[in-house]
Amino acid sequence: MKVSVSWLKDLVEFNNDIDELSEKLSMTGFEVESLEDLSEQAKNVVIGFVEEITPHPNAEKLKVCSVDVGLPKKLSIVCGAPNVKAGFHVLVAKVGAYLSSKSLKIKLSNLRGVESEGMICSLEELGIESSNEGIEILEENEANIPPIGSNAVDYLCLNDTIIELAITANRPDGMSMVGIAREISTITNSKLTLPNLNYIEDFNIFEPKICDKETIGVDCIYSITYIDSIDNTGKTNKNIFNKLSSLKQNCINPVVDITNYLMLEQGQPLHAFDADLLDNIIGRKVKPNDFGIRNGKQGELFVALDKKEYKINPTIKLITCDDIPIAIAGVIGGNNSSVSDKTTRIWLEAAVFTPTSIRNSSREIGLRTDASSRYEKGISSNMTTAVSKRASELISVQLGGDNISSYVNTDFKKKSISVNLRMDKINSVLGKLSSSDSNFVNNNSTKLRYLNEDEIETLLSKLGLILTSNDSGWNVQVPPYRSSDLTREIDLIEEIARLIGYDNFDSNMPDPLEPGVLSPTKLVERRLRNSFIHNGFQEVVTSSLVGPENTDDNAVLIKNPLLSETSRLRTNVWDEHLKILQRNVSFGAEGCWIFEIAKTYKKDKECFVETNLLSGALTGSKRLSKWGGASKQLSLDYFEARGKLKQSLDVLGVETIDKQLAEKDFMHPGRTSELFVEGKSIGFFGQIHPSQSEKFDLIKETYLFNLDFDSLIKAATRKTNWTRIYKDYPTVPYMERDIALIHSKKYSSLEIMGLIKKTGRPLLEKVELIDRYEGSSMPEDEISQAFRIRYRDAKKTLVEKDINPIHEKIRNALKEKIKAELRS
């Protein structure tokens, strides 16, 4: 938002210098992005008088002018403007001047054999106007001509500074000169003098054809005003022209300039349609009810004021006259109804549209205008009709407008927001004043104290709030222009702190000051992340937003997506994980092991369900090097991949049980297991289906895991698992025996290990798979495996006679239960 200091001084009486004012604005939330001194545009540009003109000896279209600029010697300047005449005052850029709009430095030059000692300028060359109608002749525009040789700054009204402010989304009132003037009045304790707005509700009710209810919401408004007998052929009022020019607004014609002027002044966009052109469009005289709002049609074309043709779709909202598009709502008007110097009758639109609808339309056509930027932040409907009436009055006074008739789509009443503000709540939130550099409090003593009621009333009244005292504090009525950000008690308290200055309040540290402690959940999560990283995994973070290729019927759709590729929330994580593996392998990585703690989202009837997952994927091999040893090549088969996951999960202190998973579309049917913790299924681990390997151009030995993170954390932080119980270190040795067997493939190694553990109690301490073989030398439905069993008695050293009965019992159980053929 660009703000003219000269314009501000018409609205508020402040005496602060520009740097001090900029500092105050920045400290109260209006960050100053840049300062521009407009007088630099007219540096070395002076008032000159053309005394004599002679033809150029070597160029038919050029003239040699003798110009008096207040120096002892007249300047000889070569000029090609057709309207240059002797006996008139002009603007002269002397040698050394820099015209920033043209990036041109004026030098002593030789033009076709004649020396030129400067340049006679047009307003376009000085960056004042966009039109190029020749040089500026002062007698045509100014009765009181400045002295010859004087600086042109005052004549050009460039004795001004432009402050560019960053306006936050919660302060749409800052998108107007009046809004910034109110802020400056408050922070500098200065008198405010604002233009009067007429809130008398004398608009007629009409029924526009609003087919799209999303554009005009409950708190929105649509009004039009008919004005005829306008003389739009002259020049714009000088005051309005100068203010628009200072803010780099193109001056078009008086009607359009008045609408732009009021948009900058009040923050309410206005748009004027040429009534005669509208009559021609629909083939009859336009009536108020002919106006409407609808969605665009796919493939519809629209030529806007910028002469560009835009392709319309149903996301874009259109203003129509008898269903014919005449504007893109809140963004830009149509070329078919544009106001020109020939316009004598207009329909003036003043409306408030929903921010979302304007944002969508603006994004779809790739155009952001001054009007759309204001609508996107939100505008109060309370001021719309009043600003429209002010525009009608200016047009009537300056351009002779007559027969004014105003219409509005609803019997709109000014809405007020009331907030209860408690004195004790202010004190408890803000604490005591430690010092004060503020205009609102006086705390010269070093003693800490709370704000008093008079100080609070003075400050809030300056903001335009109306306070009514009650037992606990005040009932505060919020003005329309602050209705978007002052809706709660805490908002008012924040406003008090913002204006007094946060650094003027005493800072209280917690007493006693205790170090922060991670909760068990966060501690386990941190340990788990570190464990995965130590085992060779890399953590990734993927986007929660996905495109329409996610065809899950339960996917949560985004109502206002920025792109079609981010139009819904993900229902799984593995799709993106497989893409990451694909990218890394395509870039030459030998292997890629990744994990992520992430959320997925689904619809469940009327509710939305978020699920916390621990997911990951592994493909290829990795080299894990250690100090003092050579790198070891790890080839990744099913059991090694599952082993890496097991090692990573061991830090949780919970046991995971694998059971074969019958079927999962994207997983290999014979190489996928369902994982259980404490008897509850928490997810799966396995090799991806060959079709997925082909789809993502990955090797077949690619593995996925997808686990319920909350269930894992719950089990890990359960008191029996979380509270570590001290166990004496064994003082007696263990004994180990191996069992090798051939058995049917229908029995998994985990089932066999479970049977061994159950049978070998109480001396069996540990069992692990140490060898596995399947191949052409064995029947297709059989497999050979070897297990190592560890026995130990905590009280004594075991001997053969202690172990033999139990070991034989295990062998018999394997023969009977799974029909195993024992090899050892």
Curated annotation (Swiss-Prot):
PROSITE patterns: B5, FDX_ACB, TRBD. SUPFAM superfamilies: Anticodon-binding domain of PheRS, Class II aaRS and biotin synthetases, Nucleic acid-binding proteins, PheT/TilS domain, Putative DNA-binding domain. Residues 414-507 form the B5 domain. InterPro entries: aa-tRNA-synth_II/BPL/LPL, B3/B4_tRNA-bd, DNA-bd_dom_put_sf, Fdx_antiC-bd, Fdx_antiC-bd_sf, NA-bd_OB-fold, Phe-tRNA-ligase_IIc_bsu, Phe-tRNA-ligase_IIc_bsu_bact. Its EC number is 6.1.1.20. The keyword RNA-binding applies. This is Phenylalanine--tRNA ligase beta subunit. The gene is pheT.
